[in-house]
Amino acid sequence: MSTKVTVELQRLPHAEGLPLPAYQTAEAAGLDLMAAVPEDAPLTLASGRYALVPTGLAIALPPGHEAQVRPRSGLAAKHGVTVLNSPGTIDADYRGEIKVILINHGAAAFVIKRGERIAQMVIAPVVQAALVPVATLSATDRGAGGFGSTGR
């Protein structure tokens, strides 16, 4: 069973007429975000290029939460289009428009039309660290090994 939190959502003028973000299945983790580009001016994302795509939405998250902007697997698998800074983080105190940085890793140009589902947004609790400076860290079996040090 999932936990529900209240998130205030503001639809900006250029998102009028678009559906609000929605979970596509009962157990979905992410709400689909849509492109709020003009109907008569779709955005063409050439191969190897990236763009900041507007959603026309702003949110107010409850304290202690974040929103993560993540890729949609279908866009990545079928077209090579993904979220460049995945996951993008929306902090609880941010009130600006949610925009998605999409990059086209595919061979062909990709056209983003108004209302196209371009990313998903996952709401998650946040844990803030209390940093404690120390002279040395506790020892572990792994130590400083990284970047494939545990095998393939």
Curated annotation (Swiss-Prot):
Its EC number is 3.6.1.23. Pathway: Pyrimidine metabolism; dUMP biosynthesis; dUMP from dCTP (dUTP route): step 2/2. It catalyses: dUTP + H2O = dUMP + diphosphate + H(+). SUPFAM superfamilies: dUTPase-like. One of its GO terms (molecular function) is dUTP diphosphatase activity. The keyword Magnesium applies. Substrate binds at R72, S73, G74, N85, T89, I90, D91, K99. Keywords: Hydrolase, Magnesium, Metal-binding, Nucleotide metabolism. Gene3D superfamilies: 2.70.40.10. It holds the Pfam family dUTPase. It is an enzyme of class 3 (hydrolase). InterPro entries: dUTPase (IPR008181), dUTPase-like (IPR029054), dUTPase-like_sf (IPR036157), dUTPase_trimeric (IPR033704). Its cofactor is Mg(2+). One of its GO terms (biological process) is dUTP catabolic process. This enzyme is involved in nucleotide metabolism: it produces dUMP, the immediate precursor of thymidine nucleotides and it decreases the intracellular concentration of dUTP so that uracil cannot be incorporated into DNA. This is Deoxyuridine 5'-triphosphate nucleotidohydrolase. It comes from Bradyrhizobium diazoefficiens (strain JCM 10833 / BCRC 13528 / IAM 13628 / NBRC 14792 / USDA 110). The gene is dut.
